[in-house]
Amino acid sequence: MSDIAETSPALAGTAPKRRGSNMPLPWKIAARELRGGLRGFRIFLACLTLGVAAIASVGSVSSALMRGLAEEGQTILGGDVGFEIVHRETNDAERAWLNAVVERGGALSKTADMRAMGRAVKNTERTLVELKAVDDPYPLYGEVTLASGQALDQALARGTDGAFGAVVEPALLERLQLEPGDELNVGNHTFVIRSAIDNEPDRVAGGFAIGPRVMISDEGLAETGLVTVGSLVDYEYRLRLPAGEQTNEAVAAFVEDTKEALPDSGWRIRDRSNSAPGIRRTVGQVALFLTLVGLTALIVGGVGVGNAIKSYIDKKREVIATFKCLGAPGGLIFQIYFLQVMAIALVGVAIGLAIGAMVPMLAQASLADLLPVPTEFAVHTGPLVLAAIYGIVTAVAFAVWPLARARDIPAAGLFRDIVAPASRWPRPFYIALTLGSLATLAVLAVALTEDYQRMFAIWFLVGTAAAFGVLLLTADLMMWVARKVGRPKMPSLRIALANLYRPGAPTGSVVLSLGLGLTLLVTISLIDGNITRQVSTQLPDRAPSFFFVDMQKAQLEPFNAILDETDGIQNVNRVPMIRGPIVAVNDVRAGDVDATPDTRWALRGDRGFTYSAALPAGSELLEGAWWPEDYAGPPLVSFVKDLADGWGIGVGDTLTIDVLGREITAEIASLREVTWQTGGINFILVFSPGVLDNAPQTILSTVTMEEAGELELQLRVTDAFPNVTSIRVKEAISSVSALLEDLVLAVRATSVVTIIAGILVLAGAMAAGHRHRVYDSVVLKVLGATRAKVLGAYALEYALLGFGTAVIAGSAGTLAAYLVITQVMQAEWAFLPVTMAVTVIGATVITMGFGLVGTWSALSRKAAPILRSE
């Protein structure tokens, strides 16, 4: 106490001065108290470590993926610059521009991608395949490795029997029960499977695939007869720029020069810095969500930090009161314990960073085959620094309040607080410091996101803050109701209700800690359940059995004849489809249109459109009027409302499309809302009759029929028309469902972090009131209560606490999920009572379990020592 005496005017000069120590007084006292170990700070440490580790792990993995995309950009794209054109090959001007690069020392490769039917010759099994035809220079970067060890050009070459070779993904061999050497019929040609594909360097850039890959040569594609006028083919042109033009600046300059030289080409341009924009966007969005979930876990842990400090201060009240009696000012008290808290926080942050840095590297072996890009996990300092900042700021935000309250309570009040804790607000400076720390967390979470992610981050934080507010109000409401109920006749219920609002009750901490995690879990579970229900249950009920794609007009009559001869046909829809880009909106070229980020996609590349005399099924007319069935006037078009709003246009404005070099301008006659979830045929653009009747087109047909005859119809149609691609809706839904299941599993796994944080905080909240619980139990036993009655009263208290928290959290999570499903995804909502029931029961059981563990320990204490100490 001599150090404090030195700072007290009343005691100045009464204590001997120590020599050889220049450490400031707050540091010395804090260090002495920390020598006693981390007892009382374990929950604090665990909460902080968990949140920091979650954020650091997610950041490290996403940084590794982003670095992989950047470093392997040339290989993933297949060139320095890539050009994608749908439906047609390059025209003379485009070809001349690309060839000029080759003449300067560059290289050019062309591939053609389309979906087709692959039929096994030996067993007539067939499946939808992703067909890719490549030329001799392919690939410009990277290497296609085959299981057979052959070179790609040898494997795809024409054999002595006249058949071209093909290499396939192993999944195709398994699905069709084939092996290398067997024959595969695609279109009008029978290929020999030469090998399975081990690695296709640019596979990631191709986007979502429904079927397995089949790779053939461009000469082999010509033999199939699949490419006709109107066929849905993606042509990819990849350039390797000359040696002196491969810097990032030179690549960017070449892309800009191309856009200026050929502004109306309609092709989609990508360079190696954005080789897989879909994956980059997905990784960014998932990483943002998981980081925000980790931040939520950290904030939930912050409640645990506050509880732990409150509990620690509660144990130190006598010491603090003694300090104050010796003349220690409030600022010194705050500094002593703030330094201790921050020292422990730094330990927790360090442990969390170590875990966050190690987890990706430990998981590399298991993740390598699952990740879409080559990734080398390493220590990424950026995510670790960010996680450390989050951890330290969270510790400050939740530590200042309880420490500031202890700072301003006088010594006599501290002694009285041992029996009945006082409730008072800290000084304005400490309130500002707390609010500033929370604001810093929010600003960091929003400022460090991409522009297109910012609104999501803002709404996530707003939702979290709203959940915090609702749960705090819930805790106050529960205590108010418990107080207003009065004194029930049942003793156990009376004790349970009194414990909910007694001084130092853990009600607020329990509701917050358990409620936030449960709210997030219910939200994710209900969103997952609704999506799964629509994809796996509702969509198959509404969707047709088949889509038949790339049918020619001349094939329509024999196709109808096959349908007439097939039993079980319930509905048939046939629609002409033309493809081309939207090149202008109200005479403004597509590249200059002021479109919102979420609608700009429709101005890039080719779009599918049709013409119709009648309003298509699944469309609702919102503005304007539909043309008469016998309309024969100037070109009119019906457009979808959400895109029109995003482009700032409406009825009376004009859209210009390009069909094989011919521009057609049409006036917008109406705006529609399309229900895409029906699984039927619909388009964003529907033209009036007479405009596109003679344009090159294919027929897209849907067939709904009884399941028993589906395979027979597929066999008959694909045998009769080798160029027609048959997409069985059930198989496509299975692929989408598998993708969704993987994504939801990852999100659920991360949400468990929040639940674990909540459980840790729950344990801390129970531990914080353990001393009071022991004293109450002893008094009740002395007054004659049996152990069973005391245990029953506490069990009822925890059951009420857990049940009330679960109901509110479940309701908040349900509201959040409802808004996401109906407003963001614009899908149908269904309440899933089982999810709600599991949440309520689980939360009640968890709360009772943790509470009764602590109560059992309290009931085991002997009465005499406790009473003597009090």
Region spans (language model):
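Short cytosolic juxtamembrane segments of multi-pass membrane proteins
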Residues: 408-423, 859-870
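Small-residue-rich transmembrane alpha-helices
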Residues: 299, 303-309, 342-373, 382-408, ...
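N-terminal Sec/SRP start-transfer signal
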Residues: 2-51, 278-281, 329-330, 338, ...
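Juxtamembrane segments of multi-pass membrane proteins
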Residues: 477-616, 651-653, 657, 735, ...
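Short beta-strand boundary microenvironments
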Residues: 125-174, 565-566, 570-651, 665
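Alpha-helical transmembrane segments
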Residues: 35-36, 40-45, 52-78, 88, ...
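Membrane transport/envelope proteins' first extracytoplasmic loop
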Residues: 2-299, 311-314, 330, 369, ...
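Interfacial "coupling" helices/loops that link adjacent transmembrane helices in transporter permeases
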Residues: 33-37, 279, 287, 303-345, ...
